[in-house]
């Protein structure tokens, strides 16, 4: 079928006409234009150049370039959000044109006009609805100009709700005009879709999937045809039967599941084993179920059947005999594993009457049951009616797999293996029917199905399938096996029986975890006691046998042959029982032995998942814990007296330690100790300790060849000098050659020496795996008050140490005391130092971190939950701002707002003719009217034609340093001088580079956050640079802010707190700048980065660069020094105003020179002050430091001093700043990052643990070449015009400041400094009472 379809639909390439070529090419271009337009609309950015935006300073962000930006801006301005639908409409029109390009219909101009009217109505109403109900997009109206006009027209007349309804009505009419669809049709379509969805959902919920589907039934029929042979019936009958079955199954899906098939089974008179549903085979040989001899409801066939055993002339026992032959020949349905038994041949069918009868007992294999037979006593006679070949029905073949099966044991075990069938009427017992059914089950193939039959036929049918209630049921003995080889057919059970049985079995599987399976009642009931099925007890077995008694003798031989054949594949073994049901037996291969009730034992994994530990597991854990305790327990090596002595020594040591911590060092000296007694006690103690050590190592046995113990071997002079001091000094342990001894399996006990008895040192014996090198001295962190004692934590508790261990705590060993064995320099005692005092010179070793830079975990993390922005409150504030501006006769509209962590900026669109200066002058009045602390007016917003109004938030958020440092802008910046400032009003981090500033001036009043901002910048560089990259010179006049950084390896010198030393440090920076410029000039580079690259290149070439300016007398170096990498130098001055007030004008020139020239040399200044007045921040300093940061200041004058413009006086404080970056005149408002003192101390301690600072000598010291402490009598400190001024004064013989000022055209201050320098040199005299000076130097030589 598919081949024919392919041949009919073969595609051939046909050429288009010229008109169609042009049309398709044009359509393709239009579609591409629509795609480009959609990309331009989606990537629209307000800062791009467009019709409403003409000035920009950034690259174009729009994907469509400049045309895309212009077109997107125009469409948004006209249509608003409806501009996004324009590309979709264009693509739809192209598709419509391409689909109807071949239609030659005449154009209906009236219809075209109606469609045009509908399109216009849709566009206008859509824009109007968007303008009324949707939020604005960017700075455009949501409906564009069209929507704004409609909304402003309709709202005064109909309000927003009425306008929306009116526009919806017009939109509906426009849709009908444009598409030609009736709304009735649209409603019907919508209703039909909804009903289809509901119908589909309801059918899905009512569908029953508890049994197999129709396809599975069809597969079952095909499978049975393949395995059991072709059914002998006409094709018409099979088609009719299949149609009836499908219709019945379709009807059963929509009826009550609990009552399904009930009426048909009870009142229709049909047999549930009719051919229309079930086929019957016996070991692969087909048998007719409608045989007149074996049916209980009719005696004649409705039609002639050539395979009828009565009409075709074949003997009635042929099907049974054929089945027996098939069983013995192939055993195709046998279990996978069968026991090998000695069975007689099949030929011996005639047996004497003395042979016992057998009960046909089905035995399951690993997956399915295999029916086998076992001998039974004569007490179970078989009725002749059950030996007829009509029992070949394969009902069990079609029933589902069950987890268990009934077993019926015979009364006594007989040695014979041949079956015997007694006459039926001799013993009419109720169990005979059940016994006969067991026999019949051997004729049906049950290899792939469970042999238990859990159904009963109604009373109207022959009780051939009546099964007894098993004595012991096991519904959850093992999981229900999944049959994949043969799909099960429909069982002859009522549907409610199937559902209830399956659900009950699932419930029992879930409930039966640890309880044994209960035994059912011993009554002949159906499997489920809750179900009532017709019983066969009402029909006596004798009457049932009499119905077919004439045929009993003819079938007996066939039955015996079949039973004999079945014994070939079944083990002959049975249990003795007194006529009742036999107990539950074990299933499997071999003899079936009795066993107790079956209980499902959970696995270890299941028990562990429920937290239940098996006894073996608990015992193993107990043994492991006992072994761990015994690892340190060496009680078998010591007697009770020794253990008591060790405990007393430990108690005495702890008491002595407590007293020493309480009273200090004098506690040991207060105890009078005689020298002779002390020596004797020391010798005795050493002897005892040595004996104990030998006992620990060698279990009390003296090794062969060992030298005897002698105190003379351990006497040396250092110990005698330390006898009176005791072990309370933190001394190191000398290195002793260890004695290689085998490791003991159990760690020795700990025994502490009493500190009151100074003793001689003893030799230290260590295990081979222990390190011989002495450990460094550590102080115990739990006891910082008494650091005299030296503690060393044991690393390997198994190996014994020379110290003594405590037997009471084997799991957590106590710190070990080490004996002093050699005199060392006494360590500084800080017993009297309070733990809260700062230890600037603290040399205690710290744990060295493994990371190259400090971890962000040292800083406080920001809160995980951030309070959302209240847009409703912002809208209310925007309306309030408009109202307050209208009170001052300023018409402005709030078009946008940008909420930040501290403030919110409202963008005002002023009316034509309104100046921004008017709002700036009203800043205080607006703050008063809006009930806020301060209002800052931003007259120019870059990239926008609006005026900004910054108002503080009601709830201020804290900006944490960690969240700013953990940012891509900071991480990706390669500069080691990268600093973070905080966040801007939009919440974006602000990161600056000190190398590009290149100097920074910070000003702010007390409490404005200036010191916190400086700390944030220092921590930023500490998180970014190594000490070899950046070095600091910190000047802190207050000795509070920067002194905390004392001891970090980045410092060039100690934190400078004396202002005279500060002037020397600045002077050293000037000299260092000059030296670096000389070196860079010799290497031909322009900045410090290029210089370091040259040095690195020389190192890679393995040819270091020698210092070109070194002379042999310059230093004590024996060899020519080479150039090394130079770090950046950052000079931080915390209180610049105090420095200026203390030193005066002496440092102004130094700062000015550094600000002018130090950038290329890698020296940068950071000056912070509280008072940004003109006498502190002079014009000379401001001119060379373009980068400024202004925190809150007191007045506009101070704001203009620091920023050259107002605005800093209206800041909110607590880190709120204005940052004026390099090459920018517009300041940026930044909310500074908050840094706690604990975070600063944590980072400082982290860097202290990494290494000690390498201070440079001579930075703060005075030298003759430098002219003293801040003096100007050195040649390098004189003014460049000093020599010319001296010549001018000596020639004119008149020394006046005004004369020097006029002659050289310099400032008054500079001229005054030159005259002062002349006075210091002795060229002119001091100023007289009249203000004149005398020239003391002689005139120049002519």
UniProtKB/Swiss-Prot annotation:
It is a multi-pass membrane protein. Residues 437-448, 690-699 have a biased composition (Polar residues). GO terms for biological process: cell division; chromosome segregation. GO terms for molecular function: ATP binding; DNA binding. One of its GO terms (cellular component) is plasma membrane. It comes from the Bacteria. ATP binds at residues 1007-1012. SUPFAM superfamilies: P-loop containing nucleoside triphosphate hydrolases, Winged helix' DNA-binding domain. Residues 449-480, 657-666, 738-829, 849-859 have a biased composition (Low complexity). It is found in: Cell inner membrane. SMART domains: Ftsk_gamma. Residues 1-24, 99-115, 180-1342 are cytoplasmic. Keywords: ATP-binding, Cell cycle, Cell division, Cell inner membrane, Cell membrane, Chromosome partition, DNA-binding, Membrane, Nucleotide-binding, Transmembrane, Transmembrane helix. Residues 987-1200 form the FtsK domain. CDD domains: TrwB_TraG_TraD_VirD4. Consists of an N-terminal domain, which is sufficient for the localization to the septal ring and is required for cell division, followed by a linker domain, and a C-terminal domain, which forms the translocation motor involved in chromosome segregation. The C-terminal domain can be further subdivided into alpha, beta and gamma subdomains. The alpha and beta subdomains multimerise to produce a hexameric ring, contain the nucleotide binding motif and form the DNA pump. Homohexamer. Forms a ring that surrounds DNA. This is DNA translocase FtsK. The lineage of its organism: Bacteria, Pseudomonadati, Pseudomonadota, Gammaproteobacteria, Enterobacterales.
């Amino acid at each position: 079928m598919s081949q024919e379809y392919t041949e009919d639909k073969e595609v051939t390439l046909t050429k288009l006409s010229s008109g169609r070529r042009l049309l398709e090419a044009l359509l393709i271009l239009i579609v591409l234009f629509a795609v480009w337009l959609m990309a331009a609309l989606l990537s629209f950015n307000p800062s791009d150049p467009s019709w409403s935006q003409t000035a920009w300073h950034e690259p174009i962000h729009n994907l469509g370039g400049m045309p895309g930006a212009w077109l997107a801006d125009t469409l948004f301005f006209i249509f608003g959000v409806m501009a996004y639908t324009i590309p979709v409409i264009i693509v739809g029109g192209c598709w419509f044109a391409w689909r109807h390009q071949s239609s030659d219909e005449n154009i209906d101009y009236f219809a075209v006009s109606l469609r045009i009217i509908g399109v216009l109505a849709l566009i206008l109403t859509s824009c109007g609805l968007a303008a009324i109900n949707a939020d604005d997009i960017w700075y455009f109206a949501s409906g564009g100009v069209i929507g704004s006009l409609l909304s402003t027209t309709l709202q005064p007349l109909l309000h927003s709700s009425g306008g929306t309804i009116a526009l919806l009505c017009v939109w509906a009419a426009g849709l009908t005009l444009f598409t030609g669809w009736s709304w009735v049709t649209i409603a019907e379509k919508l209703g039909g879709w909804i009903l289809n969805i509901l119908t589909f959902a309801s059918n899905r919920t009512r569908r029953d999937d508890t049994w197999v589907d129709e396809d599975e039934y069809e597969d079952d029929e095909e499978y049975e045809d393949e395995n059991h042979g072709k059914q002998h019936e006409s094709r018409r009958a099979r088609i009719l039967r299949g149609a009836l079955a499908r219709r019945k199954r379709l009807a059963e899906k929509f009826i009550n599941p609990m009552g399904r098939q009930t009426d048909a089974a009870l009142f229709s008179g049909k047999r549930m084993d009719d051919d229309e549903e079930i086929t019957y085979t016996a070991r692969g040989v087909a048998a007719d179920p409608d045989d007149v001899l074996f049916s209980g409801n009719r005696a004649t066939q409705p039609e002639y059947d050539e395979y009828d055993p009565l009409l075709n002339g074949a003997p009635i026992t042929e099907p049974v005999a054929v089945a027996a032959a098939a069983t013995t020949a192939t055993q195709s349905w046998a279990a996978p594993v069968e026991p090998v038994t000695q069975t007689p041949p099949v030929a011996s069918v005639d047996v004497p009457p003395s042979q016992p009868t057998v009960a046909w007992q089905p035995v399951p294999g690993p997956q399915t049951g295999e029916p086998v037979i076992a001998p039974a006593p004569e007490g179970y006679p078989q009725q002749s009616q059950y030996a007829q070949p009509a029992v070949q029905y394969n009902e069990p073949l079609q029933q589902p797999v069950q987890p268990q099966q009934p077993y019926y044991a015979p009364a006594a075990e007989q040695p014979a293996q041949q079956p015997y069938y007694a006459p039926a009427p001799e013993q009419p017992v109720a169990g005979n029917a059940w016994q006969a059914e067991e026999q019949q089950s051997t004729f049906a193939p049950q290899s792939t199905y469970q042999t238990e039959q859990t159904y009963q036929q109604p009373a109207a049918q022959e009780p051939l399938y009546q099964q007894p209630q098993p004595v012991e049921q096991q519904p959850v003995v093992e999981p229900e096996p999944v049959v994949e080889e043969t799909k099960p057919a429909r069982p002859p059970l009522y549907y409610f029986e199937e559902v209830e049985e399956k659900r009950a079995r699932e419930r029992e599987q879930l409930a039966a975890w640890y309880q044994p399976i209960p035994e059912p009642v011993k009554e002949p009931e159906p499997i489920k006691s809750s179900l009532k099925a017709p019983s066969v007890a009402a029909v006596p077995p004798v009457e049932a046998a009499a119905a077919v008694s004439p045929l009993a003798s003819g079938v007996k031989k066939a039955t015996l042959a079949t039973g004999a054949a079945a014994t070939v594949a079944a083990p002959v073994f049975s249990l003795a029982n007194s006529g009742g049901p036999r107990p539950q037996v074990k299933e499997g291969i071999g003899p079936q032995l009795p066993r107790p009730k079956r209980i499902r034992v959970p696995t270890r994994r299941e028990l562990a998942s429920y937290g239940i530990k098996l006894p073996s597991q608990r015992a193993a854990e107990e043994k492991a814990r006992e072994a761990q305790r015994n690892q340190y327990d060496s009680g078998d090596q010591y007697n009770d007296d020794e253990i008591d002595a060790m405990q007393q020594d430990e108690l005495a040591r702890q008491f002595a330690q407590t007293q020493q911590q309480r009273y200090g060092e004098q506690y040991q000296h207060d105890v009078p100790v005689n020298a002779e007694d002390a020596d004797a006690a020391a010798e005795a103690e050493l002897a005892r300790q040595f004996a104990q050590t030998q006992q620990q190592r060698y279990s009390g046995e003296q090794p062969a060849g060992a030298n005897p113990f002698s105190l003379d071997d351990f006497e040396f002079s250092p110990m005698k000098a330390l006898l009176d001091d005791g072990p309370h000094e933190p001394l190191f342990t000398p290195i002793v050659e260890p004695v290689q001894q085998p490791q003991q399996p159990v760690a020795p006990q700990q025994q502490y020496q009493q500190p009151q008895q100074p003793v001689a040192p003893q030799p230290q014996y260590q295990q081979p795996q222990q390190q011989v090198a002495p450990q460094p001295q550590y102080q115990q962190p739990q006891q910082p008050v008494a650091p005299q004692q030296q503690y060393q934590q044991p690393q390997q508790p198994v190996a014994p140490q020379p110290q003594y261990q405590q037997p009471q705590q084997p799991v957590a060993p106590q710190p070990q005391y080490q004996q002093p064995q050699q005199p060392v320099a006494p360590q500084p005692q800080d017993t009297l130092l309070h733990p809260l005092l700062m230890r600037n010179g603290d040399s205690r070793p710290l744990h060295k971190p493994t990371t190259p830079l400090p971890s962000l975990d040292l800083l406080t993390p920001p809160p995980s939950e951030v309070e959302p922005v209240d847009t409703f409150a912002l809208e209310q504030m925007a309306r309030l701002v408009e109202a307050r501006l209208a009170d001052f006769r300023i018409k402005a509209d709030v078009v946008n707002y940008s909420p930040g962590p501290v403030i919110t900026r409202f963008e005002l669109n002023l009316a034509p003719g309104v100046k921004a200066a008017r709002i700036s002058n009203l800043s205080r009045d607006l703050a008063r009217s809006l009930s806020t602390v301060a209002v800052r007016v931003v007259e120019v917003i870059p990239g926008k034609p609006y005026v900004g109004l910054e108002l503080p938030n009601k709830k201020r958020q804290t900006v944490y340093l960690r969240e700013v440092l953990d940012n891509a802008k900071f991480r990706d910046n390669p500069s080691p001088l990268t600093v973070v400032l905080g966040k801007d009003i939009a919440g974006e981090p602000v990161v600056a580079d000190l190398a590009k500033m290149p100097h920074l001036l910070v000003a702010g009043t007390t409490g404005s956050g200036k010191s916190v901002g400086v700390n944030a910048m220092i921590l930023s560089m500490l998180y970014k640079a190594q000490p070899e990259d950046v070095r600091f010179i910190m000047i802190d006049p207050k000795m509070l802010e920067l002194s905390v950084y004392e001891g970090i390896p980045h410092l060039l010198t100690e934190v400078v707190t004396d202002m005279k030393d500060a002037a020397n440090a600045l002077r050293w920076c000037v000299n260092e700048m000059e030296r670096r410029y000389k070196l860079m000039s010799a290497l031909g580079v322009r900045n410090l980065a290029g210089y370091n690259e040259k040095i690195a290149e020389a190192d890679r070439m393995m040819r270091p660069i020698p210092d070109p300016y070194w002379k042999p007398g310059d230093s004590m170096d024996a060899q020519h020094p080479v150039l090394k990498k130079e770090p950046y130098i950052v000079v931080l001055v915390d209180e610049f105003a105090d420095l200026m007030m203390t030193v005066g004008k002496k440092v102004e020139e130094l700062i000015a020179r550094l600000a002018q020239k130090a950038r290329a040399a890698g020296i940068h200044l950071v000056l912070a002050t509280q008072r940004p007045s003109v006498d502190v921040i002079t014009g000379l300093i401001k001119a060379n430091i373009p980068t400024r940061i202004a925190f809150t200041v007191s007045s506009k004058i101070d704001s203009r001093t620091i920023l050259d413009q107002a605005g800093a006086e209206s800041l909110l404080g607590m880190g709120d700043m204005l940052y004026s970056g390099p090459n920018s005149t517009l300041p940026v408002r930044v909310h500074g990052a908050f840094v706690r003192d604990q975070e600063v101390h944590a980072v400082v301690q982290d860097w202290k643990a990494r290494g000690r600072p390498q201070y440079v000598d001579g930075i703060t010291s005075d030298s003759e070449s430098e002219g003293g402490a801040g003096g100007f009598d050195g040649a390098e400190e004189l003014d460049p015009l000093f020599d010319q001024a001296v010549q001018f004064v000596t020639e004119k013989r008149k020394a006046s400041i005004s004369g020097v000022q006029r002659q050289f055209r310099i400032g008054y201050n500079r001229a005054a400094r030159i005259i002062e320098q002349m006075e210091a040199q002795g060229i002119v005299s001091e100023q007289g009472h009249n203000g004149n000076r005398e020239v003391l130097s002689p005139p120049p030589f002519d």
